């Protein structure tokens, strides 16, 4: 069945708050599929998520041309931009099996490009542009491992 929560935000301060809440409640090993149109705030959200665990936000940039960036912090933080990937074959060349078997967080922007390779055990974060600075953020997972993160955001934004 899965669980989900949707939150409307009006600015980047709200986005940062959501990232901090999520960071405090994610399991130590997590796959995050980050969906949204170009300019929706996927990389900004990723910067805030990394900053919440002590990775300087200036170190987190879009890996569009490098495809993958690995950051060491209290939790290994692997950031992948799948926009330029053609599919699973390209992932194998990046060492996908090793990446997803390591402890830490794996954040994938443009997950639809590699949908067949994504594990079912993941959290999907969808960022929808609703205005110049406003967004609708939806967290969804079929896995009960992410119930704590979804519940934490639900409690923080809707009061339970």
Residue locations for each model-derived region?
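N-terminal pre-Walker A segment at the start of P-loop NTPase domains
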Residues: 2-21
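Short phosphate-coordinating micro-motif centered on Lys-Gly-acidic
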Residues: 3-5, 91, 97-160
